[in-house]
């Protein structure tokens, strides 16, 4: 199954790090969409199917908390899992995001394994090998 993952961060280098991490975790076939702030992300979400969002907190125009609140208000996006990646790792901030509907929170700097493990927990292990039953013959793809 191919996923569509929206990466929202005002830092282009950080978006690149997250994309490389996703590809290394087996999500290389996923459609990886990018936005520099929550407002751009909301526009992308109007025209694209999104399976998961990874967002920063500190961004211009619409920060990550405002963005998560906006997503969770919309019927079409309220069930999309949102993971927050931020330098703000205090318990109060994490609780605030989780109370607004985020399903995960990773503090920067992070290890690639931290993002991979959380995404696998949310979306499941990626396995592109499928077996079709053809009677007495199995076909592996």
Predicted regions and their residues:
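Short amphipathic alpha-helix used as the core "switch/output" element in two-component signaling
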Residues: 43, 65-78
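Alpha4 helix (beta4-alpha4-beta5 surface) of REC/receiver domains from two-component response regulators
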Residues: 66, 89-104, 117
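C-terminal output helix
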Residues: 110-119
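Two-component/phosphorelay signaling modules centered on CheY-like receiver
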Residues: 12-33, 100
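Helix N-cap/capping motif at the beta->alpha junctions
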Residues: 34-43, 64
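CheY-like receiver
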Residues: 127-141
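Receiver (REC) domain active-site loop signature in two-component systems and cognate sites
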Residues: 59
């Amino acid at each position: 199954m191919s996923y569509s993952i929206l990466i929202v961060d005002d830092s282009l280098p950080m978006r690149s790090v997250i994309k490389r991490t996703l590809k290394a975790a087996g999500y290389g076939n996923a459609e990886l969409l990018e936005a520099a702030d929550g407002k751009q992300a909301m526009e992308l979400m109007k025209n694209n199917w999104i399976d998961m969002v990874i967002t920063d907190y500190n961004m211009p125009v619409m920060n990550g908390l405002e963005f998560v609140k906006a997503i969770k208000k919309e019927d079409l996006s309220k069930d999309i899992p949102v993971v927050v990646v931020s330098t703000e790792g205090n318990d109060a901030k994490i609780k605030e995001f989780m109370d607004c509907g985020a399903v995960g929170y990773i503090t920067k700097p992070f290890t690639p394994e931290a993002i991979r493990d959380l995404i696998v927990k949310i979306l499941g292990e990626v396995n592109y090998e499928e077996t079709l039953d053809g009677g007495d013959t199995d076909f592996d793809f």
